[in-house]
Amino acid sequence: YAQLLCELRKKKGMTIEEARKLVLNPLYLGCLIIKNGDADGQLAGARNTTGDVLRPALQIIKTTPGITCVSGAMLLLTHAPEYGKNGILVMGDVAVTPVPDAEQLAQIAVCTARTAKSVVGMEPKVAMLSFSTKGSAKHEVVDKVIEAVRIAHEMAPDLALDGELQADAALVPEVGASKAPGSPIAGNANVLIVPSLEVGNISYKLVQRLGHADAVGPILQGIARPVNDLSRGCSIEDIYRMIAITA
């Protein structure tokens, strides 16, 4: 595995001696085992930061073809069956990219939709969230979401996606019909894309704590093979749930 790492990083000037030291790090070794085809995925992070987990994954496994932005999705298992898929919502990005540009936000939307379909089995209905609904407010951050919607439609023409939508317009049929008449997503969204990491992290934790929802994740997206990151405050239940998702 040291030889493989040396080959992968030779353009960066890595020597075999440096590679031999790095493979003693389980995070590097795990990614090398995956890269070599000897394992299918990795779950880490109970004792490491997200940066520690992502660094070897991006250096060794790299991103999914066509994707340059790594992100994290959170499954929100709420007690409100009228929302999402029997109360299940998927939110992104909640873990990785602090201030995505329009291109990155579009990639986050497409990747989160794929996660919703592959992990939850839901047909994704993606709402690009904002403090504006269909031009109700004017601001450069709203313009970014509008541009991300356009790019996402180009990336995935068959994906059910719309924006910009406020959260209530995305989730509540009556509000959606009033604020965004004719929208295929308003009032029926099950995948929520937030405009920044700050919004995502705050939002899911408010839903988790005040709404007593179970938050499962983050599920890392955009890496070519399954690599997932645990919170350092994770429970045994968190670990086995993420093992199942990674598998």
Residue ranges of predicted features:
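Anion-binding alpha/beta catalytic cores of soluble intermediary-metabolism enzymes, centered on
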Residues: 1-186, 191-247
